[in-house]
Amino acid sequence: MRVLVACEFSGRVREAFSKRGHDAWSIDLLPSELQGQHVQGDVRDFLDDNWDLMIAHPPCTHLAVSGARWFKDKLEEQKNALWFVLNLMDAPIPKIALENPISIISSHIRKPDQIVQPWMFGHPETKATCLWLKNLPKLEPTNIVEGREQRVWKMTPSPTRWMERSRTYTGIADAMAEQWGAKS
């Protein structure tokens, strides 16, 4: 299966699919942290390239409700971010999963099909992740664990905090590849 992982610099989801024999590519404006099939560029230039599945991680900077106190000052940025999300959702790709934290996508476009937590996939942490799905089943939990630490939320400010907050948990990446990759 040809898999596009949009807006991913970590390479985690791409590699989860690659390990299972898929032709998986990540595309992001940043270079990839992991070696592999990665294009540094604008994903919109690649949406028509005959993909079977896309997992999209649009930047949450102007979408996440955690930044609600600044919403009034960034209406134009929100409008552009929502337009980008619509571009991804409307891509000519048969199967699509778009992920983002709790965000204005829910109130401006549509409610998510599913909300998952890292603790459902082997990581003893909380970080609600919404999934908007097209022709894909909901993810089934793979390893429910105890512990509900808010590690990501408690991170101290730093220049790289946003990068750590945006990395997909490996348990979730593996579940996507195992469950959605098997449904080809």
Task: Kindly give the residue locations of the regions a language model identified.
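Conserved active-site and SAM-binding loop architecture
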Residues: M1-S184
